Amino acid sequence: MKLLTDFLPIILFFVAYRIHGIYTATEVLIVAAILLMAWQWWRRGRVETMTWVSTLLILTFGGLTLYFHNDTFIKIKPSILYVLFAAALLFTHWREEPLLQRLMGGQLPAALPLSFWRRLNGYWIAFFLFGAVLNLIVAYAFSTGIWVDFKLFGMLAITVIFVLFQAVVISRALPQEAKDGDSSA
């Protein structure tokens, strides 16, 4: 359910683009992002940091797109978001507890070494920087229609493949008892 609600603004953007074009799609994206924030607040009593950052960028770059009637602003928004994510991960990379460890640490055994968390953190930094560059290439080298398709389908596919790769990396790093379901109980 969470995955669907997180992707709903992008899906609505895609549908609105196909029906009415980039400027209506941008308006729909702005409204959908605000509604997602309201829904998170109503449902959980708080808004996730990622939703705050994404909505702020959507309001800023979507607003600039509509004000100047120039779709370049909305096209660079994903790249800026990816660079911000990479920067946040990089900022904590050499600290006692990398950001990724703080975000995922409760879901994995505490026995995983700091070197593992730094490696995983580094993979995500590289992924976000790759996504930022790839988005800019598609935004500037191809039509808006191709960029919209890439934004929904291309980046989604790349993200799924990367997450599967991360699952393999994590599963190989888990202690044997965690893989076996802690059979000592």
From Swiss-Prot:
NCBIfam families the record matches: ispZ (TIGR00997), PRK00259.1-3 (NF001325)
PANTHER family documented for this protein: INNER MEMBRANE-SPANNING PROTEIN YCIB, INTRACELLULAR SEPTATION PROTEIN A-RELATED
Transmembrane stretches, start-end: 19-39, 49-69, 72-92, 122-142, 150-170
Family, similarity comment: Belongs to the YciB family.
Keyword Protease assigned: no
Membrane topology field: Multi-pass membrane protein
Pfam family of the protein (one): IspA
Compartments, as annotated in UniProt: Cell inner membrane
Disulphide linkage map: none
Protein name: Inner membrane-spanning protein YciB
Summary of the function given for this chain in its UniProt record: Plays a role in cell envelope biogenesis, maintenance of cell envelope integrity and membrane homeostasis.
Lineage top rank: taxon: Bacteria
Species, as recorded: Acidithiobacillus ferrooxidans (strain ATCC 23270 / DSM 14882 / CIP 104768 / NCIMB 8455) (Ferrobacillus ferrooxidans (strain ATCC 23270))
Principal location class: membrane
GO cellular component term, pick one: plasma membrane
Keywords, in A-Z order: Cell inner membrane, Cell membrane, Membrane, Transmembrane, Transmembrane helix
